[in-house]
Design a protein with these regions (language model features):
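Flexible, acidic active-site loops/lids enriched in D/E/S/T/G that coordinate Mg2+ and/or position polar
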Residues: 1-70
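Residue-level signal for inorganic ion chemistry
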Residues: 5, 148, 168
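Solvent-exposed alpha-helices and their adjacent loops that cap or buttress functional pockets
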Residues: 6-7, 32-38, 46, 54-58, ...
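Short acidic loop-to-helix transition motifs that present clustered carboxylates
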Residues: 21-23, 128, 147-154
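Short acidic, glycine/serine/threonine-rich loops at helix termini
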Residues: 26-28, 56-58, 77-79, 131-137, ...
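Short glycine/serine/threonine-rich phosphate/pyrophosphate-binding segments
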Residues: 47-56, 61-63, 130-131, 151-155, ...
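Acidic beta-strand-loop-alpha-helix segment within the catalytic core
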Residues: 64-145, 208-213, 220
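Oxyanion/phosphate-interacting regions
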Residues: 156-221
Length: 221
């Protein structure tokens, strides 16, 4: 990926990379890529979203790059994780990450014109999501638990032909930015809230100018 980006005629700057979080040697935050000519761009990269999936030869691992005009992409690199809510176009103006998950499921079911028990929600299978998964099931919806790959999970939730209707929960901030780009292209709904792991990370985000309490919409991301 790094070698390819070096051939592109643009002045690219990595806004969100994987370097610090995953101890990667390149494509780090702030790195300049491209030929140095052409438009100035922001870049978010996720060389492999779903490393374990790739190692096991399973589906839903992706290699992704998101590119936007310089200054338009949220630099959330100081906070590694983000809580996200993603749906297809039916969820636009209907669901809201600030609402209880059960209410969002019922609202989306109404917008889609199908019963709640036919709604399927994808969630990363992590201990931090145990209560969220139980609340989804208590609401009457089905769950699709992902071992990895929440970019694919978000994209599938926004695709008309996919078998999931919503993707929720805490995943990586880089994945959130990349997912937002895809969801905008698909006309779907995405909201995100930064999820600092401790007080030090929270303060690091505040020092970087991020709002820890803000709900970031697609255009913000």
């Amino acid at each position: 990926m790094r070698a390819f980006l070096g051939t592109v005629a643009f002045q690219g700057r990595v806004v969100i990379g994987e370097g610090e979080k995953d101890n990667a040697p390149m494509l780090f935050n702030g790195e300049e890529v491209g030929t140095g000519t052409g438009p100035e761009c922001d870049i978010a990269v996720d060389p492999i979203d779903g490393t374990s999936l790739t190692a096991a030869g399973r589906q839903n691992a992706l290699s992704v790059i998101a590119v936007s005009d310089r200054g338009s992409m949220l630099d959330a690199s100081s906070v590694f994780y983000m809580d996200k809510l993603v749906t297809g176009p039916a969820g636009v103006g209907v669901v809201d990450i600030r609402l209880p998950i059960g209410e969002n499921i019922r609202k989306l079911a109404g917008a889609l014109g199908k019963p709640v028990d036919e709604i399927v929600v994808s969630v990363l299978n992590r201990p931090r999501h145990e209560q969220l998964i139980q609340e989804i099931r208590d609401a009457g919806a089905g769950t699709r638990l992902m071992s990895d790959g929440d970019v694919a999970g978000g994209i599938n939730a926004a695709r008309h032909a996919a078998r999931t209707d919503m993707c929720v929960g805490v995943g990586g901030s880089p994945e959130g930015i990349v997912t937002a780009c895809a969801i905008k292209a698909l006309g779907g709904h995405i909201q995100g809230r930064l999820w600092p792991r401790d007080d030090d990370e929270r303060q690091r985000g505040i020092d970087a100018g991020l709002d820890m309490d803000k709900v970031y919409e697609a255009d913000d991301l």
